[in-house]
Amino acid sequence: METIDAEDAACLRRIALLGGCKGPVRLSTQALGDQLGISQQTASRRLQSLEKAQMISRTAESTGQYVLVTRSGEEHLRREFAEYAKIFDVKDEQYVLTGTVMSGVGEGRYYMSIPHYQEQFEKLCGFTPYPGTLNIKLNPQSVLIRKRMDSLEWTIVPGFKDEHRMFGEARCIKCTISGIPCAIVVPGRTHHPEEVIEVISGTQLRDALDLTENSEVVVVIG
């Protein structure tokens, strides 16, 4: 994961405030320098540094330079926001979990393909889950946060019995990843260690977010 210095981070925040997370914004180095109180040359170096760190992308058109905050840039800003939230003790508390994508054993795909569970999750979470789960290995600090989340109000997904076997209940809590509605699911019986969470969504998250093994993700609850 690329890291950036404080000056580059300030530049990234300014681009985001100008709308760079929503789409490409026309931005000259002179205008950026004026807003940040730095020279045009320094502003140009800041943009080059952010582009090298893959926090932004730039395109040159006849009407000027357009700058877009990339997904990596958004995730950096989300982590920064989470730090400020801790400092100022934001109420209606948001819990932020950070971790990396890992492969599962296919258990989630099996359960998310069962019509009963699909219907329950659609009713309780507001989306029909993609048949599969995104497995995330939490970093050590997020493991502690995840434990604190057990005191929150989780939604119970009832179990059921068919002619062959009994399917146990599960619990879930709504969350988002890069703005996409999701839910953390905890089966009644789970084989995962405490540092692993399973996330469901109405979309294939790996494809939608271009995630690969060990990609870093930020999960926001609340």
UniProtKB/Swiss-Prot annotation:
The lineage of its organism: Archaea, Methanobacteriati, Methanobacteriota, Stenosarchaea group, Methanomicrobia. Gene3D superfamilies: Riboflavin kinase-like (2.40.30.30), Winged helix-like DNA-binding domain superfamily/Winged helix DNA-binding domain (1.10.10.10). CDP binds at G104, V105, G106, E107, G108, R109, T203, Q204, L205, R206. Belongs to the archaeal riboflavin kinase family. Residues 95-222 are annotated as: Riboflavin kinase. The gene is ribK. Mg(2+) binds at T133, N135. FMN binds at T190, E198. This is Riboflavin kinase.
